[in-house]
């Protein structure tokens, strides 16, 4: 009798151990499935990104998190081999570019997340940037006195776009910094050399409100190129006057000349993988053959930050190739 009780208890112990093993196995499978599903969602559908700078103010603030859709334009498959969503990858291995079908194309005005084109290394390991698309493949873009023209049509800045302004008060009047801040001015500074002269960042709507105050003699966009020299002046001029600049797209025949070569040199040599250099007779040596044109293999986009006077964007470092686009914010 005692032996039968012992055997029964031993069987119960074995059965209990088997149940715990099954539970552990079920939990492990569930954990692996959940992890795999989360990775697939981040890879193919949605991913959160943190805004690293003030270049998109006032639309997006530095430190904000945005959810980026990879479904709109189609998810880009990995271009390097490494641990997903980590900095580790195997150097020297670059996978071919392929994007799954999306349900829309990039439109003017879209805010996109992309890999910073200037950096070297695998495309999908480059730093993430966020900007607004202003120029599309096939567009001719020109910036004059801070106004953006696309195909000769002025493009209004987004309602929350911010820029630098210059304000002159009427003689004998005063305006407090607090009142300017209350009206929407940011980063306010007062001229040390001219009484009643202020500089500040603000949206167009805030600038209109401030301009209506009786103390204001003049309010206009602030331009800096005339006050600077050297590389600083050149960069400022690019912020305020740029182009005209043709934005190439896939299948375009890009004709080269001494005038256009500086615009497209990086695009052709870095992103189109051509070996190109100018010849003394006005021709170009293109992949070992003299000529004047190249066929473009992918689309390109011109992007700007909404905080126009405090943004390093396509005015400074060029176009965004299609294979660098991550998704829509």
What are these regions (language model features)?
Residues 38, 43, 53-55, 135, ...:
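Generic hydrophobic/packing signal
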Residues 26-44:
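Hydrophobic membrane-insertion alpha-helices, especially the h-region
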Residues 2-23, 62-329:
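Soluble "head" domains of membrane/secretory-pathway proteins
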Residues 8-10, 41, 49:
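Short, intrinsically disordered low-complexity segments
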Residues 45-62:
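Alpha-helical transmembrane signal-anchor/signal-peptide segments
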